[in-house]
Regions:
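Extended, charged alpha-beta segments that form solvent-exposed binding/catalytic grooves
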Residues: 111-197, 201
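N-terminal pre-domains immediately preceding structured catalytic cores
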Residues: 58-63, 177-185, 327
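A general structural signal for short secondary-structure junctions and capping/turn motifs
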Residues: 74-77, 99-105, 125-127, 175, ...
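A translation/RNA-centric and nucleic-acid-associated enzymatic feature enriched
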Residues: 114-116, 187-342
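Extracellular structured ligand-interaction cores
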Residues: 107-109, 130-134, 210-212, 252-254
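Generic recognition of stable, solvent-exposed alpha-helical segments in well-folded globular domains
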Residues: 27, 31, 35, 147-151, ...
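Class II aminoacyl-tRNA synthetase-like tRNA-binding/catalytic domains
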Residues: 2-126, 134-138
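A generic secondary-structure signal for well-formed alpha-helical elements
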Residues: 40-47, 156-167, 316
Length: 342
């Protein structure tokens, strides 16, 4: 099958036709989400909590992503037009919530997170509207190591694997694609294997071979001086994080289902802020609390709801499982090629 053309958002696999119409797709989306949410909570000992849709900029709680994406913001009338920002993710908010809500070691929370990423370049896998399960769990400081990370990754992967088994029972056309176990590899090891390829090309090559990979150590500079992918400096520890990538044969591409990691401690936060050239963030509320030792040590991540629905339902475009907006020409062309956007 031809590889997905990342330069052409209107490309559709030849002969593609989803077995489900729009109404059947909506039912199947609920089926996926209900099962996976319970399975994730069971594997990681998580309690569902309500999530904010916007936060105050000065709190430092919003996710700055790669540092260039502009948050959507507006003024609140009753507060004299005090500005709030729609969240990009709940990566930092969750650590505050764990402390405030009285969670203990080995316990965690998850929330349904909705975000607007206005500067996203949309394609088959990316939309302006983002929905994900944001989760976070308390660990001891001495558990901030690769062994802990690997153990939690295996639990998340088990939830993903069990969900695929469940959906294969519910729908005859769904066959199991995920391997029984996930492989682990660092970004430096991947660069050494494929030094002449781009980061995204490297990811595709390794998941073609392995089926499912947890790609570790994302955000810091590699031996070549390049960064595999951008990460904000103030939630993941770049030495103890990664992405769950799986192979998606319909699009012949690496498919990111989750980004997760052990969160920064005082030392990692200070170092990473210096590397990114933004030490002034230490004066924000979140960063002050962390540096003062007031927040728990945690591991956490985000799992794309539309992403896993697209993957399990074997859809060609994320717009088939999330109601977002698309350029007129893209929407019209996709509709004419059998891709029915919500």
């Amino acid at each position: 099958m031809a590889a997905m053309n990342n330069m052409n958002p209107m490309w559709v696999p030849e002969g593609y036709e989803s077995p489900l119409n729009i109404r059947e797709t909506e039912v199947a989306i609920k089926c996926v989400k209900d099962f996976f949410e319970k399975e994730l909570a069971r594997q990681l000992n998580l309690t569902r909590v309500s999530a904010p849709f916007f936060v105050y900029p000065e709190s430092g709680l919003n996710d700055t992503l790669n540092g260039v994406e502009r948050p959507v913001h507006f003024g609140v009338k009753e507060q004299g037009d005090r500005e709030v920002e729609i969240v990009h993710s709940l990566a930092k908010w969750k650590r505050f919530a764990l402390k405030r809500y009285g969670f203990k070691h080995g316990e965690g929370l998850y929330a349904d997170m909705y975000a607007i990423r206005r500067d996203e370049d949309t394609d088959h896998l990316h939309s302006i509207l983002v929905d994900q399960w944001d989760w976070e769990r308390i660990i001891y400081k001495e558990e901030r190591n690769e062994e802990t990370l690997r153990n939690i990754v295996k639990k998340v992967y088990k939830a993903l694997k069990n969900t695929e088994k469940y959906m294969a029972i519910q729908y005859e056309y769904i066959e199991e694609l995920l391997p029984s176990e996930i492989s682990f590899m660092t970004t430096q090891e991947l660069l050494d294997m494929y030094p002449d390829l781009t980061p995204k090309e490297r990811e595709r090559e390794i998941v073609r071979e392995k089926g499912a990979v947890f790609l570790m150590k994302i955000g810091g500079a590699l031996g070549s001086g390049e960064i595999h992918d951008g990460r904000a400096p103030d939630y993941d520890d770049w030495e103890l994080n990664g992405d769950i990538l799986v192979y998606y044969p319909l699009l012949d591409t690496a498919f990111e289902l989750s980004s997760m990691g052990i969160r920064v401690d005082e030392e990692a936060l200070t170092h990473q802020l210096e590397v990114r050239g933004c030490p002034e963030r230490k004066d924000l509320m979140f960063h002050k609390a962390l540096l003062n030792g007031e927040l728990p040590y945690t591991i956490g991540g985000g799992i794309g709801q539309a992403r896993i629905c697209m993957f399990y339902l074997r859809k060609a475009h994320i717009g088939e499982v999330i109601a977002s907006v698309w350029p007129d020409k893209v929407a019209e062309t996709l509709e004419g090629r059998g891709v029915h956007l919500l």
